[in-house]
């Protein structure tokens, strides 16, 4: 079974978007895990920097997790990169590969994760925006998570 961690290294998922995302993940037969700080923890970001880092590290270090999927981009993940790289040696000890999914500010984590931590990185919609994704792209994304061959053809 694929285990997906819902993370918020940048902005938070507001309202009921975290629960909707968790329900969507589970509706596909995957196991969803929330690594989100309490909503409203910070006036701008999902939480203060130290708290966002702690939640992200918990997700990375959880041996069950296959995929880290950001609930939202926006800003703030760049601030976490130096702290992740300080822990590079311990983070590289994962027994199975880790995939990071998301876009926007999450791109900073994509670059660091791919170049320094050996993560597989896929530039995808965030979980908050997944429901505004066109059906063809969403179907390809589901196939990608299911490890099926993905081929995109222009209409």
Predicted segments — roles?
Residues 1-64:
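ATP/NTP phosphate-donor binding region
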Residues 87-112, 120-127:
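Short, acidic/small-residue loops that bind anionic groups at enzyme active sites
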Residues 16, 77-81, 110-112, 133:
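Short glycine-/acidic-enriched loop or helix-start segments at secondary-structure transitions
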Residues 9-10, 37, 71-73, 103-106, ...:
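Fold-independent oxyanion-binding glycine-rich loops
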Residues 67-83, 103:
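N-terminal glycine-rich "phosphate-gripper" loop used for MgATP/nucleotide binding
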Residues 118-155:
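Conserved anion/nucleotide-ligand pocket segment
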Residues 4-5, 66-67, 99, 119-122:
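Structural motif
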């Amino acid at each position: 079974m694929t285990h997906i961690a819902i993370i918020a290294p940048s902005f938070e998922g507001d309202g009921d978007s975290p629960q909707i995302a968790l329900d969507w993940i589970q509706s596909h037969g995957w196991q969803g895990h929330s690594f989100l700080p309490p909503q409203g923890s910070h006036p701008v970001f999902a939480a203060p920097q130290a708290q966002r880092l702690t939640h992200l590290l918990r997700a990375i270090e959880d041996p069950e997790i296959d995929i880290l999927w950001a609930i939202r981009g926006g800003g703030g993940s760049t601030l976490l990169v130096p702290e992740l790289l300080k822990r590079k040696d311990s983070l590289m000890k994962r027994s199975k590969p880790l995939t990071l999914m998301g876009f926007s500010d999450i791109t900073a984590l994509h670059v660091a994760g791919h170049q320094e931590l050996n993560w597989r990185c896929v530039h995808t919609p965030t979980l908050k925006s997944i429901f505004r994704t066109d059906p063809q792209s969403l179907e390809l994304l589901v196939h990608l998570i299911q490890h099926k061959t993905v081929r995109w053809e222009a209409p």
